[in-house]
Amino acid sequence: MAALTLRGVRELLKRVDLATVPRRHRYKKKWAATEPKFPAVRLALQNFDMTYSVQFGDLWPSIRVSLLSEQKYGALVNNFAAWDHVSAKLEQLSAKDFVNEAISHWELQSEGGQSAAPSPASWACSPNLRCFTFDRGDISRFPPARPGSLGVMEYYLMDAASLLPVLALGLQPGDIVLDLCAAPGGKTLALLQTGCCRNLAANDLSPSRIARLQKILHSYVPEEIRDGNQVRVTSWDGRKWGELEGDTYDRVLVDVPCTTDRHSLHEEENNIFKRSRKKERQILPVLQVQLLAAGLLATKPGGHVVYSTCSLSHLQNEYVVQGAIELLANQYSIQVQVEDLTHFRRVFMDTFCFFSSCQVGELVIPNLMANFGPMYFCKMRRLT
């Protein structure tokens, strides 16, 4: 019976006239109309292969395969939730608080006279900053964050290397702080976790990105802090901040728009390597210099600025720092000093892989055993 049924189906298919199928039900996907001929992710990889193979030499194949592999994350504990309970839950997953573990280890070394680097108090953002990661080589993933008993999310998943610029900023209690390019909001949230900001200005030019920032603040920060005088969210042109609020801030974070190297290899949406964004990409270093210069102008004499990107490119990293310092010296007679952050390599070497040949600043490079980054950061002090 089954054989007869199968034979009947075959005979029926032979008799079906496909021409009788209504045109609206027939569709042949036109590849050229639906997919770009040269996807932006492929253009990004071609660009990186040409430039980074020269910049990094024998290191590039390792960095390349890591960039193309799954990224590793850290869980930033929300101190506005029941942080001790949250920390205990993360410890049960065999994750470790890499910030406080590194600080404790560094303090023991300093007390034993094994290190000549600055004490943790001189560079650590705050002992209240807690971020959990899995050990090197452990590719476990954190479960999605959920609202806790206090009504805010318990932790924020982020590239743990993104916390290093905040740590490098060295916040002190009562600081007036500016996050010049704040969206989507991970570093802004980290700044608030320190408990050191008397006032925090969080700015971004893009309305859509500001909406993402507001969403994070609403999910993680209590209403009385979010809507009070402590946090101010603006959508101004960051390049003009030196004119708007010059000589105002104790600490400024300048996390500039960049080629977002890892994102550019995985996502077509909002990819800066799209052919239509070629000019925008070419002038990125100019924009970055302008933003860093504005951040330095907004800082009080004696204050500190940290410049950061999530790009490997020295054109967007060291060259921008040097260009902004020269610009301020020549046009404003303002002297800026780059601060040494080499101790960050030793303090956090168990968690991150650092590139050892930066001219100024520090660079976390992706590595299969510790697949964070890329993250470049450089600390400066405005002298005059």
Swiss-Prot record:
Positions annotated to bind S-adenosyl-L-methionine = G185, G186, K187, D204, R209, D237, G238, D255
Q: Which CDD domains match?
A: AdoMet_MTases
Q: Which UniProt keywords apply?
A: Methyltransferase, Mitochondrion, Phosphoprotein, Ribosome biogenesis, RNA-binding, rRNA processing, rRNA-binding, S-adenosyl-L-methionine, Transferase, Transit peptide
* Cited InterPro entries: MeTrfase_RsmB-F_NOP2_cat (IPR049560), MeTrfase_RsmB-F_NOP2_dom (IPR001678), RCMT (IPR023267), SAM-dependent_MTases_sf (IPR029063)
- GO molecular function, one example? mRNA (cytidine-5-)-methyltransferase activity
What GO terms fall under cellular component here?
Answer: mitochondrial large ribosomal subunit; mitochondrial matrix; mitochondrion
Enzyme Commission (EC) number: 2.1.1.-
The lineage's top-level taxon is: Eukaryota
Residues in the active site? C310 (nucleophile)
Residues with the modification Phosphoserine, per the entry, are S206
Q: Which BP terms from GO are recorded?
A: mitochondrial RNA catabolic process; mitochondrial RNA modification; rRNA methylation
**Consequence the record notes for mutating C310W:** Abolished methyltransferase activity
Compartment(s) where it occurs, according to its Swiss-Prot or TrEMBL record = Mitochondrion
Recorded consequence of changing V65R: Disrupts complex with MTERFD2
Q: Which reaction does it catalyse?
A: a cytidine in rRNA + S-adenosyl-L-methionine = a 5-methylcytidine in rRNA + S-adenosyl-L-homocysteine + H(+); a cytidine in mRNA + S-adenosyl-L-methionine = a 5-methylcytidine in mRNA + S-adenosyl-L-homocysteine + H(+)
Transit peptide boundaries: 1-25
| PANTHER family recorded | 5-METHYLCYTOSINE RRNA METHYLTRANSFERASE NSUN4 (PTHR22808:SF3), NCL1 YEAST -RELATED NOL1/NOP2/FMU SUN DOMAIN-CONTAINING (PTHR22808)
Role description: Mitochondrial RNA cytosine C(5)-methyltransferase that methylates cytosine to 5-methylcytosine (m5C) in various RNAs, such as rRNAs, mRNAs and some long non-coding RNAs (lncRNAs). Involved in mitochondrial ribosome small subunit (SSU) maturation by catalyzing methylation of mitochondrial 12S rRNA; the function is independent of MTERFD2/MTERF4 and assembled mitochondrial ribosome large subunit (LSU). Targeted to LSU by MTERFD2/MTERF4 and probably is involved in a final step in ribosome biogenesis to ensure that SSU and LSU are assembled.
By sequence similarity, the record places it as follows: Belongs to the class I-like SAM-binding methyltransferase superfamily. RsmB/NOP family.
Q: What is this protein called?
A: 5-cytosine rRNA methyltransferase NSUN4
Output the lineage of the source organism. Eukaryota, Metazoa, Chordata, Craniata, Vertebrata
